[in-house]
Amino acid sequence: MAAKPGIPKGTRDFSPVEMAKRNYIFNTIRDVFHLFGYQQIETPSMENLSTLMGKYGDEGDKLLFKIQNSGDYFNGITDEELLSRNAVKLASKFCEKGLRYDLTVPFARYVVMHRDEISFPFKRYQIQPVWRADRPQKGRYREFYQCDADVVGSNSLLNEVELVQMIDRVFGKFGVRVSIKINNRKILTGIAEIIGEADKIVDITVAIDKLDKIGLENVNAELASKGIPQEAIDKLQPIILLSGSNEEKLETLKTVLATSEAGLKGVEESEFILKTVSALGVKSEVELDLTLARGLNYYTGAIFEVKALDVQIGSISGGGRYDNLTGVFGMDGMSGVGISFGADRIFDVLNQLDLYPKEAVNGTELLFVNFGDKEAAYCLPILTKVREAGVRAEIYPDASKMKKQMGYANDKQIPFVAIVGENEMNEGKLTLKNMTTGEQSLVTPDELLAVVKA
Amino acid sequence: MAAKPGIPKGTRDFSPVEMAKRNYIFNTIRDVFHLFGYQQIETPSMENLSTLMGKYGDEGDKLLFKIQNSGDYFNGITDEELLSRNAVKLASKFCEKGLRYDLTVPFARYVVMHRDEISFPFKRYQIQPVWRADRPQKGRYREFYQCDADVVGSNSLLNEVELVQMIDRVFGKFGVRVSIKINNRKILTGIAEIIGEADKIVDITVAIDKLDKIGLENVNAELASKGIPQEAIDKLQPIILLSGSNEEKLETLKTVLATSEAGLKGVEESEFILKTVSALGVKSEVELDLTLARGLNYYTGAIFEVKALDVQIGSISGGGRYDNLTGVFGMDGMSGVGISFGADRIFDVLNQLDLYPKEAVNGTELLFVNFGDKEAAYCLPILTKVREAGVRAEIYPDASKMKKQMGYANDKQIPFVAIVGENEMNEGKLTLKNMTTGEQSLVTPDELLAVVKA
């Protein structure tokens, strides 16, 4: 007998129920993307390694899945090189292609290749799997979907406003209460400027983030332990203790950052986004949060992050503004802003809060039990008509034992079962069983349709 | 400057318009799958090579994309092995994983791994890309989507009937006239039996298929040239000349195959499928076609193939009944029947016949022109309301030149544009331009919504 098959570690099969839930998530997000004028693209799973390498740092390069060249992959490699066993160096000889690591680099590559046919500003979304040779662990997979929306070729803050509205609408549709956190890279730059410690900005945000947990004294001690001079720590006090409404925070920052051009610009941008969003009436809480420091190497303006309020889990969505998407491919000045929805975490959140609508599962609504050839022949035209009316329906294909057929209906959570034997055929009717209530009734085909569609 | 980036040969980017069309195709098929009780699964892109190797013949093994092991892939390979440069043999040392080559083997693997949680008969569909290191050529790609529906764990011919109904409904929805060809492996076995030439069945079907083109004499000559004795060719005459309605063909076959148990079984199965399908009223032409010989190594009963009637192109869908899906993984007796829709060819057919409905493109319905901050601020609440009403709408994010903004509307084929300047703001109205007719009218926000939604 063949060995029992398995799947590579860090990968997953998605069963029908999981798929239905995932489709509900992606379709909901997709509808919002369309509502805001975003258009879908897809890029190949495989990219040339020359496109991928060097874009994610040394660590990222190691995590790329590389595809062995077809045919004689030893071609062009000397014996000496082979015996050197230099896995990193020879990878580029054995392999010309790799699996995409994220959606951003392929998007940048796409924009450069298709620049002449794209009408900018280009609002694109992309929902595709990515692959990373990470050590698999709970909640971290080697293959997972990313779900990104970006608009490139526009510096307007209206794009940031729209993205906040989109986040608000997506989670509103899901019924998940979220807090949308906003920061701005320029504010962080301003803070670094006024205290003269540009390279300590991450240490500072990490320390400030602990204020609630460890208190002001300990925050200041941590800052000192990171080598930040007392004078700078003194200047940081109003920022560490920043509180109140977004408006109050912004007013404080205007004073503190008065001498930093970048800082004031960041405050102004944040003010516009927060005011406009608030005027347009989003339902989620939107909060200026200076401790938000995701993607600092990459983001140049607004930074977003979304936290679920009723589930303990990391951020379920995030993004920001960047200045130069395509510079690595020799095309400068392509700024943009984007967000990414974390499908796996959203899946977990909706599961924990039990928020999947029943319709989302898209399953069979009506099963015809099969008692034999004659009964099946009686059912088939009715089944065909029922489907014609848009009802998802099936007949159990074999005349198996009743128990097995009802078990099938239960497993597939089919809400209605039609049963046809001698009596029903003689009367031109069917017995319709409501699987939820257990109720049974003798109905005509038209009545059956009315009940099931109700 | 960095080199201009490209993509691996045989792969494709899908632009927004292509994506919208592809989504229309997949969503249409998906809806039909759901209507018939099929449920979606997804399997990982990467499978263990032990799962994939040996399933597609030697040629197929060569066409698998193999993924280089992470870390030190030289581990466990001796210097002698390296210097042997045996690319085929060492591939299994360098690589443990490969990209999926089709959806059937991963499905079989899935069924074996999840047998205890599946409620049989299991009606599953799967729409995912597959990868083959084929030589790229026109219409043949190294990455392409397959779209398969199978039901396993049931021998009932009602499954075959349903699949024909599904094919009929899918192409009916597309508006593509098709001919659904049906054959049965057992009929072909019967033919081989009565003439005593079991290994010549492919030669025979190929020769018969040429009847219309080259005439009976040449068909017989070709059969003789393939080493089929005259006596056998004589017996084949009624089969070569088989014509008339499906009923007439079946009657002839009953006589010709009278001494073959398998042959008669095949006739009986075909008769049931054709009669039942016809009684249920499919719209497509359904034809018994003995020259249909796809997947003869694999199919054991019914064989299907779908041809578009109004476009010159290969089959756009096909499938059949198989006896033992999971035997290669040590689980016997799992018979099933399935069909596969050829997405790329269907895409071409719908393009050639111009059959994409306008709604399929899902694009923006209304663009607000942006004349500046004040005008944008006036538009934003209206835009928000319009979206609230389900209209896909956007505002041009920058106050660019009118020409550029109108060009954007044209490129995205946006049917309505709202223009707001001083006058409109003073009157609390908007100028709405119908981009198809060129008509302009001054409307209130409510009137705008009514026109755009109409």
From Swiss-Prot, chains A, B:
It comes from Phocaeicola vulgatus (strain ATCC 8482 / DSM 1447 / JCM 5826 / CCUG 4940 / NBRC 14291 / NCTC 11154). Its EC number is 6.1.1.21. Belongs to the class-II aminoacyl-tRNA synthetase family. Homodimer. Keywords: Aminoacyl-tRNA synthetase, ATP-binding, Cytoplasm, Ligase, Nucleotide-binding, Protein biosynthesis. CDD domains: HisRS-like_core, HisRS_anticodon. GO terms for cellular component: cytoplasm. Signal peptide: none annotated. The keyword Nucleotide-binding applies. One of its GO terms (molecular function) is ATP binding. InterPro entries: aa-tRNA-synth_II, aa-tRNA-synth_II/BPL/LPL, Anticodon-bd, Anticodon-bd_dom_sf, His-tRNA-ligase, HisRS-like_core, HisRS/HisZ, HisRS_anticodon. The gene is hisS. It catalyses: tRNA(His) + L-histidine + ATP = L-histidyl-tRNA(His) + AMP + diphosphate + H(+). It is found in: Cytoplasm. The keyword Aminoacyl-tRNA synthetase applies. This is Histidine--tRNA ligase. One of its GO terms (biological process) is histidyl-tRNA aminoacylation.
